[in-house]
Structures are given as structure tokens and as C-alpha cells.
Amino acid sequence: MTWRTWYKEHLFTPEQAVQQIKSGQRVVVAHACGEPSIILDALVAHAAQYENVEIIHMVAMGKAAYCQPQYDKNFHHNAFFLGGSTRAAAAEGRVDFTPVYFSEIPNLLREDLRPNVTLLQCSPPDAHGYVSLGVSVDYTKPAAEASDLVIAQVNQNMPRTL
């Protein structure tokens, strides 16, 4: 099977992709410009099918709708850093805050907070079938390597990095 055939067989809508996430799982979301907003929107849109999904995120750059009070039974956010979209939920005691040095996050995800699923953005495949995490390699790469499942939002505008 060529990589092109494999790739076509693994293309899903965001709604189909989030169906792979199960209640009680730990989900790591890529950081900053790597945050897959379309996948997160689909996850929140299907919140009723989830219970106690832990979402680990650095600084949520998007709306972080999963931190809204109506989703408290569906999602539990564990933040390494707090930002504008998560700070109020943390102040209300609805978000866990795990203080950690940025440099320690890869080992934390490999050893102590091993994810079931990683949500990220990537570039389209190159001529050899390789994708790039672009501007979000930081803890995203070790999270993806440690995960049982990676759900990627392919972004035509994600630059290729080595």
C-alpha cells in the first residue's frame, strides 16, 4: 500500500475523528498556533457523548469552550499555564493547574501524564508522505509519540519545519 492510499483511508471529518475519543481518556492539545480549533469545536459539539475527558493544554489560544461550566461533567481541563480563556475557570476551581517548567513537559507526558489521544495540526504530506508539526513542535511531538492515537487537523498553511 502506498502512503497516498493509506492517507486517503485515514481522512475523516472532524466529527468522525472525535468519535474515536472515549470517556475517561486523557487528551493532550497542541500548543499555540498548533491548536486544532476545528477538532476542538467538534469535540465540544459532541460533549454529550463524553464523561470526564481530561484535556491537557499549555496556554489555550482559542476559546477553550470545554472550560465552560455546562461542560464540567464532560471535560476536565488540566492547564500547565493559564491564559485568558482558562483563567476564570481556574479561579472558580473548575480547572486544574499543574505548575511545571516548560522544559519538563515532554518527560511529564512520556512518563507521568501519558496521553491516550493527542490533538494537533500538521502540514499536508510532502512527496514522500511526511507531514510537519510546523510551528508547534514543543511538547506536541513527545505527546504524539506517547499517545495511543493522534488526531491531526491538516492545515494547508502550516509551514514545514525540520
Model-based region annotation:
Residues 1-162:
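Conserved alpha/beta enzyme-core scaffold
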